[in-house]
Curated annotation (Swiss-Prot):
HAMAP family: IPP_trans. The lineage of its organism: Bacteria, Pseudomonadati, Pseudomonadota, Alphaproteobacteria, Hyphomicrobiales. The gene is miaA. Monomer. Catalyzes the transfer of a dimethylallyl group onto the adenine at position 37 in tRNAs that read codons beginning with uridine, leading to the formation of N6-(dimethylallyl)adenosine (i(6)A). One of its GO terms (molecular function) is tRNA dimethylallyltransferase activity. Its EC number is 2.5.1.75. Residues 50-53 are annotated as: Interaction with substrate tRNA. Belongs to the IPP transferase family. Substrate binds at residues 27-32. ATP binds at residues 25-32. This is tRNA dimethylallyltransferase. NCBIfam families: miaA.
Amino acid sequence: MATSDMTAEGPERHGRRPAAVLIAGPTASGKSALALKLAQASGGTVINTDSMQVYRDLRIITARPTPDEEALAPHRLYGTVDAAVNFSAGAYVEAAAAALAEVRAAGRLPILIGGTGLYFKALTRGLSAVPPVPAEVRDAVRLRLDRDGVQALHAELARQDPEAAARLAPADRTRIARALEVVLATGRPLADWHQQTSPPLLPPDDVVAVFLAPDREALYARIDSRFAAMLQGGALDEVAALAERQLDPLLPAMKAHGVPALIRHLRGEITLEEAASIGAADTRHYAKRQFTWFRHQLPEFKWVRPEEADAFLNTVIPGRA
């Protein structure tokens, strides 16, 4: 298995307490258990770094920590956002900055855990300075998307921002709409904004960063069994309550793994068994993409197998054995 060492000047090399511990990994890899164990052992606070677990409407289908688990150590940024909100990476960084300040003021160790690579990249590399898109521009683009279709929007993007149009898949509704919104609102292509970044909240040299990398086949089997357990635990009722709100299907919460398939089942389009199969398959594909993304985008994260987790814990906090 490919591994990568953390930066040579990281805090663990100097025997000092890190500014934070970052625990990433694919879905269902055991991140939450590792973070909770570390929080209990080190006096830490667990901070969510997952783009779907921020939504209060989706505790079960996103595998958020249970109330019993949350009672064992302080948790932050879980279930704090309504599903009607398009919660951006910029909004996350702002919320994370406040959470980090609170945790540090209390003298606790921040433990950031999740599978959203963009959030970790924004925290450790800085965030692109894309300004907020006015609501009227966003609404106009989405109206055109619904009325004219994604191909028409892609053609318009090719005229406004040829580089983005060439880079994006012609059927990628969300990213095409986003790129068009930015160029229409600012007069500048998205790539221009991406070249400008804010200072990172958590410079790589100040943190310990780990990526849990379990055996692929074992992970995929765990994903399948966990999705079945979610259904038994009330995921269908949770999604039904979300569907009743009739929110914009392009909102992030409406695209959480399993949600679209279960909504199709609730509409009578597919059976529950088919919905479960689709939801589990989508989650497996996402896990595969997480491996690839972190390997190429954040090589400074140290890759460890879950069974190496205890040894990892002993290296994080100086003096802990």
